[in-house]
UniProtKB/Swiss-Prot annotation:
Known tissue expression: Predominantly expressed in testis.
Coiled-coil regions, chain positions: none
InterPro entries referenced in this protein's UniProt entry, alphabetically: OSCP1
Keywords (A to Z) from UniProt: Cell membrane, Membrane, Transport
Phosphoprotein as UniProt keyword: no
UniProt organism field: Mus musculus (Mouse)
GO MF annotations in UniProt: transmembrane transporter activity
Gene Ontology annotations for the cellular component aspect, listed alphabetically: basal plasma membrane; cytoplasm
Function: May be involved in drug clearance in the placenta.
Entries under PANTHER family matching the protein: OXIDORED-NITRO DOMAIN-CONTAINING PROTEIN, PROTEIN OSCP1
Annotated protein name in UniProt: Protein OSCP1
Source organism phylogeny: Eukaryota, Metazoa, Chordata, Craniata, Vertebrata
Length: 379
């Protein structure tokens, strides 16, 4: 497992989250000033310098539930609120989109180009905010500094780590189904056409070499695909043509996007039972959340500006039905991390959580001894 995977996972999933939110803000006719504020606040929080410095420290990936909690905080960093079902759908769309992009990367190194495509689009969302654009550019420089010197083998390990993270997710997405890049069981279709990876040849030739490295025989074969040579390599500079289209905004065509659980995902979820089996990484996940969320600077709303609720479904009825029909094992509502043994860490986490300003009313049936992590999930 690569300890350099987390920044790429976080930034690409965050980019997909912003694509979905932008599409839904436009679909629900949210006033332009409010929509811009939401995206600006989320991006500003996401690319906070302290947060990025913590994120780029070498560290292993943790559970999907721990990461989901961070995105839940991020999505609520402004005046917008999402119900549980809409947040579930948002996270499903984010994860399946990036899984597709990782699967189709021509070379392991191209996951960096996918990340740059996301950053390029994110800068477009905040083009009127030079300060936030500077934050994104600083993150680009961090990416170039950290990943620019990695070998092909290290990028391959990063790709394998990402695929392991996504391996049990087979959620059907309407856009993928309509484009025939996903089967009805939620698995993606790998293409047998198009450009081959930069620096490689179109398949169809086998060369045999002697022990001295001299070519002694050449054989041709029918590969059955429709491949072409890559015309040029994508740019890894701050500004440039990425060539690769993976990571660009697939919602720009304003198509409604639906998600459905495949039977494979339901079976995998029933086997997983992440919340029931004691997690040996629980303490590490708590540390991870405390460090990551401690670096986030959630801006408290200034003035009496009212918030609004964003629905990722066509109607409220659809949202309610989705909440009821979602398998319990796939619910991210509670992270079962017990941290009662470490009083100092509990106090630090309580201080961190106190900095988050969420306007929704807390449930009244909570007790004083509730676990801090359960309290965090109800904020």
């Amino acid at each position: 497992m690569s300890v350099r995977t987390l920044p790429l996972l976080f930034l690409n999933l965050g980019g997909e989250m912003l694509y979905v939110l932008d599409q839904r803000l436009r679909a629900q006719n949210i006033p332009g000033d409010k929509a811009r504020k939401v995206l600006n606040d989320i991006i500003s929080t996401m690319f906070n310098r302290k947060f990025m410095d913590e994120l780029f420290k070498p560290q292993e990936l943790y559970s999907k539930k721990a990461l989901r909690t961070v995105y839940d905080r991020l999505a609520h960093a402004s005046i917008m609120r999402l119900n549980q079902a809409s947040m579930d759908k948002l996270y499903d769309l984010m994860t399946m989109a990036f899984k597709y992009q990782v699967l189709l990367c021509p070379r392991p190194k191209d996951v960096l180009l996918v990340t740059f495509n996301h950053l390029d689009a994110i800068k477009g969302f905040v083009q009127d905010s030079p300060t936030v654009i500077h934050q994104v550019d600083e993150t680009f420089r961090q990416l170039s500094e950290v990943y620019g010197k990695l070998s092909e083998g290290e990028f391959q390990l990063i790709r394998q780590t990402l695929l392991n993270f996504f391996q049990d997710l087979h959620i059907r997405v309407s856009t993928f189904l309509k484009d025939k890049v996903q089967n009805s069981n939620g698995r993606f279709v790998l293409p047998v056409s198009g450009p081959v990876p930069w620096g490689t040849e179109v398949p169809g030739v086998i060369r045999v070499f002697s022990v001295k490295g001299k070519e002694v025989k050449k054989m041709k074969f029918r590969h059955g695909g429709d491949y072409v040579a890559a015309q040029k390599e994508g740019s890894f500079e701050l500004y440039g043509d990425r060539v690769l289209k993976l990571g660009t905004n697939m919602y720009s065509a304003s198509r409604p996007v639906e998600t459905h659980m495949s039977a494979t995902s339901k079976n995998a979820a029933s086997r997983a039972q992440e919340n029931i089996v004691p997690n040996p990484l629980a303490k590490e996940e708590l540390n991870f959340l405390a460090r990551l969320m401690g670096g986030m600077e959630i801006k408290k709303p200034s003035g009496p500006e009212p918030g609004f609720r964003l629905n990722l479904f066509t109607t409220d009825e659809e949202e309610e039905h989705a909440a009821l029909s979602r398998p319990e094992e796939l619910s991210y509502e509670v992270i079962s991390i017990q941290a009662t043994q470490d009083q100092q860490r509990n106090e630090e986490l309580a201080r961190i959580m106190g900095e988050f300003e969420i306007t929704e009313q807390l449930e009244q049936n909570t007790s004083k001894g509730d676990d801090l992590l359960a309290m965090m999930d109800r904020l």
